[in-house]
Structure formats: structure tokens, C-alpha cells
Regions:
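Core dinuclear metal-dependent hydrolase active-site scaffold
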Residues: 149-152, 157-189
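Active-site HxH/HxHxD metal-binding segment of metal-dependent hydrolases
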Residues: 70-154, 163
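Conserved beta-strand hairpin/beta-sheet module of binuclear metal-dependent hydrolase folds
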Residues: 19-72, 185-198
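Divalent-metal (often Zn2+) His-rich catalytic cores of metallo-beta-lactamase-fold enzymes
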Residues: 188, 194, 215-252
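Active-site environment of divalent metal-dependent phosphoester hydrolases
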Residues: 37, 58-59, 85-91, 112-116, ...
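Accessory terminal helices/loops
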Residues: 2-9, 124-125, 136-141, 226-228, ...
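Active-site neighborhood of phospho(di)ester-bond hydrolases with catalytic His/Asp-centered motifs
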Residues: 52-54, 78-86, 106-109, 176-177, ...
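Divalent metal-coordination and catalytic microenvironments
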Residues: 24, 43, 53, 68, ...
Length: 252
């Protein structure tokens, strides 16, 4: 059954596009949050910005970056953090690198090692597959464009925890996998009381455990509940708060 709970935040403000959360923190949301329709984030500091994930293909990522143009005009994106290795959170990197060729990319070591497992060429081939297999695959991913995607591996990896300075703003990365995948990272902005969870949180949908163990996922929820926060940006679904974390933890 879906992980839905009255404690979760309302979907009333769940609209496609860029949402400002706090001064300099943004979420890019993609309803309905189903397979491939992931969220991303932008953290703007003094003269520079950090992107939390890209989207599933180049066209979607281009539209997202266009929506961020006003925020990044004087604060270019110089770093992207990958929350995990699945393509809906990083296949758009080439579009980001086209606009900012010197952009650095950061991921947990286990995330980097998993990134080669499902290349976009495989997804492109399955989108063209005949018969029931292709029909089923297109029912999930037929709206995405996997041709012409060039992947850029992370330029920096970390284990455990990494703190970054984004134009004077402290951004804390916590490796919490293996859980959803072999490597999962959450991104926390203490000043803004905001956390970007990647696919550690599916709000309004069922959490998918590709790696596990569940104990790690529950521990990740407990870690987030120990943070001073108001706003929670899930990997899929509408914005939530601490109650959304509790609901996912209790479901698991």
C-alpha cells in the first residue's frame, strides 16, 4: 500500500516548477512524483550556488535551469551534489556542464561506484523494445528522452559526512546509505532549517528498497529528525515537514 498518512504535508501547493523555500533555498518539483518524476534543489550563496541533483533527461534539466536563471544570474552553479546513482537524479549533468563547464560534482563513494550499473543507453534501448517488455517500460519511462545523454562522473567523492561552503552558507552532506540504493546522501542547510532528502523520502508514494537494509533507512529518518529543520524536500512528491519523515519511518 502507498505510504500515505494524515501527518504528511498537504499537496495544495504541489505544482510543477521552482518554489522558493527560504531566502536563497529553492525546490524544483515535478508532480505527480511517480517513476522518473523527481525533485531537485538549489541553494544560493554569495556569488555561487549549489544544485541538489539534476533531472532525468537533458530537456527536463534545461527547463529547470531556465527557471533558475534569475536566481543564478549573479550566483552561478559551481557545484552539484548527487543524492544517489539513479538516472532521474543525475542524467541531466551534461546540460549543467554545458552552461557551467567548470561545475564540480560531489557524490558518496558508493554512489559513484553504482553509477555505471544502468547507463542511459540501456534505458533508450528498452524504450524502443518491441512487445510487452517495451510496452511496459514505456508505460513508466516513455515520456523521457535518453538519447544523446553524456554522463560526467563525480569530480569529488566522500564517505560519511562532508561540509561545504556555498558562498558563506554552510551545507552539510550526510551519507546514509545503503538504503534506497547502494549509496544515499541527504543535504542539510542549517541556516535555512531545510533538508533535501533524495529518495530517502517518497511523499505520497511507496518507498522502494533497492538496496537496504531497512534499518539503515530508518536510521536515516532518525538522523533527519535530530536536525533543526522546518522544510523537507523529498526526492519525489510534495514538500513536507518533520511529520512526513515520521510517517515514512513508521511505514518502514
Amino acid at each position: 500500500m502507498p505510504c500515505q498518512d494524515d501527518r504528511m504535508a498537504s499537496t495544495a501547493g504541489y505544482t510543477h516548477g521552482l518554489h522558493e523555500l527560504d531566502d536563497g533555498c529553492f525546490a524544483y518539483l515535478q508532480p505527480d512524483g511517480g517513476w522518473g518524476w523527481s525533485n531537485a534543489g538549489l541553494i544560493v550563496g554569495d556569488g555561487q550556488s549549489l544544485l541538489v541533483d539534476t533531472l532525468f533527461d537533458l530537456q527536463l534539466t534545461a527547463a529547470m535551469l531556465d527557471s533558475m536563471a534569475a536566481a543564478t544570474a549573479s550566483c552561478p552553479v559551481d557545484t552539484v551534489v548527487y543524492t544517489h546513482a539513479y538516472g532521474d537524479h543525475w542524467y541531466g549533468i551534461a546540460e549543467l556542464a554545458r552552461r557551467w563547464p567548470d561545475v564540480a560534482s560531489v557524490a558518496a563513494t558508493d554512489t559513484e561506484q553504482e553509477m555505471a550499473d544502468v547507463p542511459p543507453t540501456m534505458l533508450a534501448a528498452r524504450n524502443q523494445a518491441p512487445g510487452e517488455v517495451g510496452e511496459l517500460f514505456r508505460s513508466f519511462f516513455g515520456e523521457f528522452h535518453f538519447d544523446g545523454i553524456e554522463l560526467v562522473p563525480p569530480t569529488r567523492t566522500f564517505d560519511g559526512r562532508l561540509d561545504l561552503d556555498v558562498g558563506g552558507r554552510r551545507v552539510e552532506l550526510f551519507e546514509v546509505g545503503p538504503a534506497h540504493t547502494a549509496g544515499d546522501t541527504i543535504v542539510y542547510v542549517p541556516e535555512a532549517r531545510t533538508v533535501y532528502t533524495g529518495d530517502i523520502l517518497f511523499i505520497g508514494g511507496t518507498p522502494i528498497v533497492w538496496a537496504g537494509p531497512l534499518s539503515n533507512w530508518i536510521a536515516a529518518c532518525d538522523l533527519m529528525l535530530g536536525l533543526d529543520l522546518d522544510t523537507v524536500v523529498p526526492g519525489h512528491g510534495p514538500l513536507t515537514d518533520r511529520a512526513g519523515i515520521v510517517a515514512v519511518r513508521d511505514y518502514l
